[in-house]
Design a protein with these regions (language model features):
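N-terminal alpha/beta PP-like core and its mobile active-site loop of ThDP/TPP-dependent enzymes
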Residues: 1-217, 256, 263, 344-347, ...
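Glycine/aspartate-rich loop-and-adjacent alpha/beta segment that forms the canonical ThDP
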Residues: 8, 52-75, 282, 381, ...
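Gly-rich Lys/Arg/Thr-decorated short loops/hinges at beta-loop-alpha junctions or inter-strand turns
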Residues: 9-13, 56-68, 129-130, 230-241, ...
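Short glycine-rich anion-binding loops that position phosphate/pyrophosphate groups of nucleotides
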Residues: 50-51, 98-100, 124, 161-164, ...
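A general structural motif
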Residues: 68-81, 100, 139-142, 247-249, ...
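Thiamine diphosphate
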Residues: 94, 146, 152-155, 160-164, ...
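Active-site diphosphate/adenylate-binding microenvironment
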Residues: 229-315
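Acidic, Ser/Thr-rich peripheral helices and adjacent loops at domain boundaries
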Residues: 360-377
Length: 429
């Protein structure tokens, strides 16, 4: 069994690999794995031979000190060039990615000094929620108002973002603008888009350095935010309801769910056609409370990661959105695990009775989509039979009533949205 090169398999995923060598070195090997995870800032797989499992060893607590130092400070001609571009910009914009989450306060100070709006990549969703000029997600998931602002901007200062094709909309959003990229990881700079200036440095320290020089040179604020209507920056239009009878409108459902769930929550999304509307319309309080499970483009990972999130933070509700295909693949067999653990978990199944990503492709090619459709069992009934509470809804009124009835429920719950496969919005990617 498992007679493959496990080290090479793990390395191919981007994770690190640490081998437990002998029973005598177990505590050191485990400590080494924890050390590497902190220093390398990536998952480390600890590989232990099965025949070690029942051997008795003397436990000796081993902790390796992690030597940390502030990240690099920007300097030299590259810094001068970047500051010159920022100082001369009429409509600057600050973009933060997952690599700049810890720099939140410094980025806000810089944005306020420049009078520049703030935006995030998908993985940094929620970072600037409370700021009046928060544009939310930058890229193909932007609101119409945010798209207009991006179009008007002349300088985009990017912190902790690799600027991949979804963020830049295949590069179109960055055309005719000066792009400054700040990242501590060399591989993140210029990988997808070549910037006009690049600073291999810590995001927070760089923002503070730029701010200091702007003040030192008495550079006037841009005034860009004075042109903006802060009320519209994060508003996505609802659109026309074309949903067939017997089904619930998906976008309207999300608007109801956004208002109904506690704001201090953990948001998890599985993969599928449904997910991009969730990313746009369902908020998370901060990036650490937002879990995207489709990193490999694979569906069926959502419930497993939701269980982990609920165990890690039992004092907050976890809300997980999944499609019907993803729930059948990896959710239905784990729902009872959530029940047995008594987790504070609500699962929303966007059930369009189809593999939605394929359904739209068949329609686009004027082919019969019936091959992509399925007559699933009732997910609500299955959830109830597994020890939870399941409710299927086909109207907004039924959804609102279901949410009221679930208030105070002490077991995992599931709300099945019965959707029209012909009226689920296209993925915004």
């Amino acid at each position: 069994l498992q007679s493959i090169d496990q080290r090479e398999l793990v390395k191919a995923t981007g994770a690190g690999f640490e081998q437990v060598r002998t029973t005598e070195t177990i505590t050191k090997d485990v400590a080494r794995a924890y050390y590497r995870a902190q220093v390398e800032r990536r998952p480390i797989v600890l590989n232990m031979p099965a025949d070690f499992m029942w051997q008795e060893v003397e436990h000796v607590a081993t902790v390796l000190d992690v030597f940390t130092a502030p990240g690099g400070v920007a300097e030299g001609n590259a810094l001068d060039d970047a500051i010159g571009m920022i100082a001369s910009a009429r409509r600057p914009l600050i973009l933060a990615g997952a690599g700049a989450v810890s720099a939140k306060d410094s980025l806000i100070k810089l944005a306020d000094r420049l009078e520049a709006p703030l935006a995030t990549t998908l993985k940094a969703k929620g970072l600037f929620n409370d700021h009046p000029y928060n544009m939310d997600i930058f890229g193909t998931l932007s609101t119409p108002a945010a798209y207009d602002i991006i179009a008007k901007s002349d300088c985009i200062v990017c912190f902790g973002s690799a600027l991949h094709s979804f963020t830049t909309d295949q590069g179109k959003l960055m055309r005719n603008k000066r792009v400054i990229q700040v990242d501590i990881e060399p591989s993140a700079i210029g990988g997808s888009l070549h910037p006009d200036a690049a600073l291999l440095a810590d995001a927070s320290l760089t923002a503070e350095t730029i701010l200091w020089w702007l003040n030192e040179a008495e550079i006037a604020p841009s005034g860009f935010t004075k042109e903006l209507d802060s009320e519209t920056l994060t508003v996505h239009p609802i659109g026309t309801n074309k949903t067939a009878t017997g089904c619930i409108n998906y976008v309207q459902s999300l608007e109801v769910l956004e208002s109904a769930f506690p704001k201090d929550r953990i948001l998890v999304t599985d993969g599928g056609r449904f997910m991009t509307e969730v990313w746009c319309r369902i908020s998370a309080p901060d990036p650490q409370s937002f879990i995207v499970t489709a990193n490999f483009g694979a569906i069926g990972q959502g419930l497993q990661e939701s269980i982990g999130a609920a165990i890690a933070d039992p004092d907050r509700p976890v809300v997980m959105f999944t499609g019907d295909g993803g729930f059948m693949m990896g959710g239905i067999n784990e729902f009872n695990t959530a029940v047995r653990l008594g987790l504070n978990l609500t699962v929303i199944v966007a059930n369009d009775s189809a593999y939605g990503a394929e359904h739209i492709q068949f329609l686009d090619r004027k082919m019969d989509p019936s091959l992509t459709t399925f007559d699933w069992p009732s997910f609500a009934e299955v959830a109830t039979s597994l020890g939870g509470v399941g409710i299927q809804v086909t109207t907004i009124e039924e959804l609102e009533a279901a949410l009221v009835s679930l208030d105070g429920v002490k077991v995992p719950s599931l709300v099945e949205l019965k959707l029209d496969p012909n009226d689920v919005p296209r993925m915004r990617i």
